[in-house]
Amino acid sequence: MGLSPGSAKLGSPAQPLIAPAATGILDPRTGRPVGADDRFFVEVNNELSDKGFFVAATDDLITWARTGSLMWMTFGLACCAVEMMQMSMPRYDAERFGFAPRASPRQSDVMIVAGTLTNKMAPALRKVYDQMPEPRYVISMGSCANGGGYYHYSYAVVRGCDRIVPIDIYVPGCPPTAEALLYGVMLLQKKIRRIGTIER
C-alpha cells in the first residue's frame, strides 16, 4: 500500500498517522456500537427492544450467579496452606473472580483441603464438610491431599482426602503454586457452569 504520485501525502488530513480514538462505545471505523455484529448481542438487543425484559432459564441465572460468587473456606493442614493464602493476596487477587474467603463452613460453598490429612483429622474434615450448605464443592490441593504424597506409606496418614469427602477438583503439586490453585478455581467455575447447581 504505497503512495502513488498525486495521492495524499503521509500525515495529511486525508491519511492520518494516528488511528482515530473510539468515542464512547462507538467503533470509529464503522460508527456503530462496539460488538454490534456479535450474534449474542443482536439477540439480546432484539429481545430487550421488543419486550423490555430478558427471558432466561432460572437454572441458567442461578448457575451464572453461583459461579461469580463462590465463598471458600480454608482447611489448611500443612505447607500447601501457605500457597493457598498467597492466592488470596493482592498479587493474584482471587476475589476478582468472585472467589471470596469465609471463616465459617455454614457460609461457604467451597472447601480447599490443603495438606496432609491424618487419621485423627479425618473426622473433623467430614464434620466441617457436613456443615456446609448444598451445593458444596471441594478442591483437593497438593500431593498429600490428593493421595498421601510424601507420607503415603505412613500408618497415620489418609491416602487421599477423597476417601473422606467427594472431591470436585484435584490440584497437583508439592506444593502447587498459587497460579495452579487459581486455575483449579477457574476449572471449578467452568464445571459448575457446565453441570448446573440445582441438581448435583
From Swiss-Prot:
It is found in: Cell inner membrane. One of its GO terms (molecular function) is 4 iron, 4 sulfur cluster binding. Disulfide bonds: none annotated. It holds the Pfam family Oxidored_q6. Its cofactor is [4Fe-4S] cluster. It catalyses: a quinone + NADH + 5 H(+)(in) = a quinol + NAD(+) + 4 H(+)(out). It is a peripheral membrane protein. Its main location: membrane. [4Fe-4S] cluster binds at residues 79-80, 144, 174. Signal peptide: none annotated. The keyword Iron-sulfur applies. GO terms for cellular component: plasma membrane; respiratory chain complex I. It is an enzyme of class 7 (translocase). GO terms for biological process: aerobic respiration; electron transport coupled proton transport. Keywords: 4Fe-4S, Cell inner membrane, Cell membrane, Iron, Iron-sulfur, Membrane, Metal-binding, NAD, Quinone, Translocase, Transport, Ubiquinone. Binds 1 [4Fe-4S] cluster. The keyword DNA-binding does not apply. Its EC number is 7.1.1.-. NDH-1 shuttles electrons from NADH, via FMN and iron-sulfur (Fe-S) centers, to quinones in the respiratory chain. The immediate electron acceptor for the enzyme in this species is believed to be ubiquinone. Couples the redox reaction to proton translocation (for every two electrons transferred, four hydrogen ions are translocated across the cytoplasmic membrane), and thus conserves the redox energy in a proton gradient. NDH-1 is composed of 14 different subunits. Subunits NuoB, C, D, E, F, and G constitute the peripheral sector of the complex. NCBIfam families: nuoB_fam, PRK06411.1. Belongs to the complex I 20 kDa subunit family. PANTHER family: NADH DEHYDROGENASE, NADH DEHYDROGENASE [UBIQUINONE] IRON-SULFUR PROTEIN 7, MITOCHONDRIAL. This is NADH-quinone oxidoreductase subunit B 2. It comes from Rhodopseudomonas palustris (strain BisA53).
